[in-house]
């Protein structure tokens, strides 16, 4: 990697760290190429991204960003996962770590808040933004559904009463 490529990588990572809402750092030594490819596919499916960068270059890119405190975790063979959804990258990383014991979550950051490994795992258990939106829409629609059910209930009861009288008259 020549100097221009390194500067381009630092610039790209710097922009990513300034615009992303969550960063997860993990050790990946011992993972096969197939396992890394699987991790990348899973991250991409959830809207997250995985980068393997030289620690020195990543530390330079972290300077001046909200997640600069993550630089202390960059020791050894580390991988950086990030996403704009605060739950996507941690959720995929935690699920992948459960299946692969060679993938060890070191910690991360959400905004200016530093997270240890347990913090990342706790973040992974939270519902995603889409799930929260779906729950909110369900809560908003629930009263309208109840009103519709209540307004049709008397008519349904009246129809059943007339039906019972009709059966009673036919039997007599």
From Swiss-Prot:
Record-level Gene Ontology MF annotations: large ribosomal subunit rRNA binding; structural constituent of ribosome
Chain segments annotated as transmembrane: none
Concerning Pfam families, the annotation shows: Ribosomal_L10
List the InterPro entries hit by this protein, alphabetically: Ribosomal_uL10, Ribosomal_uL10-like_sf, Ribosomal_uL10_bac, Ribosomal_uL10_bac_type, Ribosomal_uL10_CS_bac
The answer to whether keyword Ligase applies is no
GO process annotations (BP): translation
Keywords, A to Z, come to:
Ribonucleoprotein, Ribosomal protein, RNA-binding, rRNA-binding
Give the CDD domains listed for this entry: Ribosomal_L10
Gene Ontology CC annotations of this record: large ribosomal subunit
- Answer whether the UniProt record assigns the keyword Chaperone to this protein: no
Q: Where is the signal peptide?
A: none
Question: Which Gene3D superfamilies does this one have?
Answer: 3.30.70.1730, 6.10.250.290
Q: Which domain of life is it from?
A: Bacteria
* SUPFAM superfamilies reported for this sequence: Ribosomal protein L10-like
Query: What functional role does this protein have?
Result: Forms part of the ribosomal stalk, playing a central role in the interaction of the ribosome with GTP-bound translation factors.
Matching PANTHER family: 39S RIBOSOMAL PROTEIN L10, MITOCHONDRIAL
The family annotation for this protein states: Belongs to the universal ribosomal protein uL10 family.
Q: Indicate the quaternary assembly.
A: Part of the ribosomal stalk of the 50S ribosomal subunit. The N-terminus interacts with L11 and the large rRNA to form the base of the stalk. The C-terminus forms an elongated spine to which L12 dimers bind in a sequential fashion forming a multimeric L10(L12)X complex.
Q: What is this protein called?
A: Large ribosomal subunit protein uL10
